[in-house]
Amino acid sequence: MSHFKSKYHDELIANAAYIGTPGKGILAADESTGTIGKRLSSINVENVESNRQALRELLFTASWLFLQYLSGVILFEETLYQKTAAGKPFVDVLNEAGVLPGIKVDKGTVELAGTDGETTTQGLDGLGARCRKYYEAGARFAKWRAVLKIGANEPSEHSIHENAYGLARYAVICQENGLVPIVEPEILVDGSHDILKCAAITERVLAATYKALSDHHVILEGTLLKPNMVTPGSDAPKVAPEVIAEHTVRALQRTVPAAVPAVVFLSGGQSEEEASVNLNAINQIKGKKPWTLSFSFGRALQQSTLKAWGGKTENVKAAQDALLTRAKANSEATLGTYKGASNLGAGASESLHVKDYKY
């Protein structure tokens, strides 16, 4: 083991533990300009900076009741420097509510040479300098998304290794510059595979990821894991939440060290309600679970809100109420106490799956 110790060592551990506070989770609001444009177009709103700012202000200035269910918000670079209509930086709004600002630092995926359409994530060049700039701007954690797919021969060992080591290099660079790295090896739900295949692939990918993190001397106590839940493929028959929970927790038990403070699941195209119900089932599983099991949801926290808002100022209160409903549901799910929604809002049961999803 290396004798290297980041000057941010204690701060990293404290911030990772804070983000993993039981009952709280992360709002992923780090969509690229192109991706948020697709969200806005779905409600017939033009993708211009003023509308993106208005949506983010709606999200970040929701009532304190909403913010009490969050410990972190992941921002896109544009958003890190944006302000409310009254001129207050979003970073200050979040900090005053006790919510840590985070930042997406990867530059998207590119095809991995020598594979059948598999990808690797770019963005390591200049990452240290960017992390220092983001830390100075108020960010305290970061996100990097690696993407793997399940197929007849995928993911290949080459793809698993390349993505695991990319995540590890990103993680140690973040820690050297004061940012808690969220490690996100997402296995896409695309395909007709059953849950057993997803479980086996998830275990392989997570095992390789933690081997790489160890090789790079990453401080695990100062990291978070953002994995997929273990589910059947999008074209396969669905299974009960209890089955998803059993396979998901087992995969984590077999691969994720107890030193990791929290696992914050991605929603992976599940509907808002489906993601909450499955997270609740995961937290109801008995047995060894040394990590907080929480959420880092984007689409699965925002869909009802978008529908309620529709780009209209007069709908902001209704949209924030919808956001509060989903945030409260997911907070309860992290504690295993969510009872399900008796009256689902518009969009809450709508599948959010997009094939070959790009953030």
Curated annotation (Swiss-Prot):
Matches recorded under PANTHER family: FRUCTOSE-BISPHOSPHATE ALDOLASE
Catalytic activity: beta-D-fructose 1,6-bisphosphate = D-glyceraldehyde 3-phosphate + dihydroxyacetone phosphate
Pfam family, one: Glycolytic
Protein residues bound to substrate: R52, K143
Subcellular location per the Swiss-Prot or TrEMBL entry: Cytoplasm
Top enzyme category: lyase
Biological processes annotated in GO: glycolytic process
Record site feature (Necessary for preference for fructose 1,6-bisphosphate over fructose 1-phosphate), residues: Y359
Keywords: Cytoplasm, Glycolysis, Lyase, Schiff base
Pathway: Carbohydrate degradation; glycolysis; D-glyceraldehyde 3-phosphate and glycerone phosphate from D-glucose: step 4/4
Cellular-component GO terms for this entry: cytoplasm
Organism: Pisum sativum (Garden pea)
GO molecular function, one term: fructose-bisphosphate aldolase activity
Protein family: Belongs to the class I fructose-bisphosphate aldolase family.
SUPFAM superfamilies: Aldolase (SSF51569)
Active site: E184 (proton acceptor), K226 (schiff-base intermediate with dihydroxyacetone-p)
Protein name according to UniProt: Fructose-bisphosphate aldolase, cytoplasmic isozyme 2
E.C. number(s) listed in UniProt: 4.1.2.13
